[in-house]
């Protein structure tokens, strides 16, 4: 069996590599996560009152987009409507439960799309399929699905070309429920024929293949596994989405943040199997970007300044090594990118605490002939020996004053 060729818009999505997820809504005012309405069994009329204090006065779409861009993100996926049912966009009469009817009196998605366009970032729209707000979801599901379809139609018609739509919530009803996905996706293709369509399969079904119109499978809060595309009718991309702490929407008492090193490792290990990495940020009550979360993205950006070429242009390569070490091959076939984890540091034993090793690293199944290897961060040449399919490389440690979590070398091919 053969592997189907990727459609261009899907391969373009894969090349984006790294994106920012943004969860922001009425729930952000409470600071207890995006599921607070459900988890605390809140009365919906009381929850709706949060709309009366939603001013979005701190929301600066351009600042948000620049935070993503400076981190090396090529796209952003923003919650246009989450499970609470409140829309950040003008629903054009479908509902009064939206940002233009709040004290904000603004179409926040318009501002977001405009800022993305200005700074060369591809805008994606998250949209819930589950809705705790409208009674239609429980009482007249067919009518609800038409409301959902019309809502998505508004997003597809009114904001120019978008990168894609990221749906979430089909896991909320029993297996076999008819969500009328064909009709929903047909509407998208009518207005956005090259939009990436994602429908999150949730924590319990990572990587599951769904409707034929789906373009990418999801790995929520878990590192992706290699995709077996042999015999597939259509080439599918893959994407891991992850929080920087334990909540998607802001949790004001959640300080369990992942380290920059862990986030960088996850980005790299996503690219090892050809998956994108979608890392979340949760703005504050009125849209301000949290300084600590912004700083985390900033540190990733400093790493991406050195190694972004490998993240964007590298594709999975079958060479094997010890630990997490791996290789990617450039799209143009001119380079191998060698990712080295847990590298030690060069320094005085009285002050330097190294990683697991520095020295010789072996790779097997290296089918390409190499003419030279250098660290991408400083251009220093590395000694290596290649024999048949084996490569042994002397991975020199970090110079004192430098420690980058994952270090990448570039090997020029003959």
Question: What are these language model-derived features?
Answer:
Residues 1-414:
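Mature catalytic domains of secreted/periplasmic carbohydrate-active enzymes
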């Amino acid at each position: 069996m053969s592997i189907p060729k990727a459609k261009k818009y899907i391969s373009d999505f894969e090349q984006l590599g790294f994106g920012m997820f943004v969860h922001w809504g009425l729930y952000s005012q409470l600071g207890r996560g995006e599921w607070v309405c459900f988890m605390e069994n809140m009365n919906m009329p009381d929850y709706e009152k949060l709309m009366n204090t939603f001013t979005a006065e701190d929301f600066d779409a351009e600042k948000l987009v620049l935070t993503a861009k400076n981190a090396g993100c090529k796209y952003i996926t923003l919650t246009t409507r989450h499970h609470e049912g409140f829309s950040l966009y003008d629903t054009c009469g479908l509902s009064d439960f939206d940002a233009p009817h709040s004290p904000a009196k603004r179409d926040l998605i318009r501002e977001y799309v405009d800022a993305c366009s200005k700074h060369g970032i591809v805008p994606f729209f998250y949209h819930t399929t589950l809705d705790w707000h409208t009674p239609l979801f429980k009482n007249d599901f067919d009518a609800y699905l038409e409301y959902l379809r019309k809502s998505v139609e508004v997003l597809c018609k009114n904001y120019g070309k978008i990168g894609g739509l990221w749906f979430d919530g089909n896991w909320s009803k029993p297996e076999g429920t008819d969500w009328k996905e064909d009709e929903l996706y047909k509407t998208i293709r009518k207005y956005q024929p090259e939009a990436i369509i994602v429908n999150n399969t949730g924590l319990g079904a990572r990587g599951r293949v769904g409707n034929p119109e789906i373009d990418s499978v999801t790995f929520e809060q878990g590192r992706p596994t290699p995709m077996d595309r042999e015999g597939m009718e259509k080439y599918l991309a893959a994407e891991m989405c992850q929080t920087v702490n334990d909540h998607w929407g802001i949790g004001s008492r959640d300080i369990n943040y992942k380290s920059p090193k862990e986030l960088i490792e996850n980005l790299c290990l996503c690219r090892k199997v050809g998956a994108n990495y979608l890392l979340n940020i949760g703005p504050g009550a009125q849209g301000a970007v949290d300084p600590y979360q912004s700083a985390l993205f900033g540190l990733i950006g400093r790493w991406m300044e050195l190694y972004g070429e490998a993240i964007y242009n590298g594709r999975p390569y079958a060479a094997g090594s010890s630990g997490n070490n791996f290789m990617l091959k450039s799209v143009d076939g001119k380079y191998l990118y060698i990712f080295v984890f847990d590298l030690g540091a060069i320094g005085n034993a009285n002050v330097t605490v190294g990683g697991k090793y520095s020295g010789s690293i072996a790779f097997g199944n290296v089918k390409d002939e190499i003419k030279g290897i250098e660290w991408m961060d400083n251009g220093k040449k590395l000694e290596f020996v290649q024999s048949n399919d084996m490569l042994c490389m002397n991975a020199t440690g970090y110079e004192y004053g430098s420690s980058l979590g994952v270090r990448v070398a570039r090997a020029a091919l003959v």
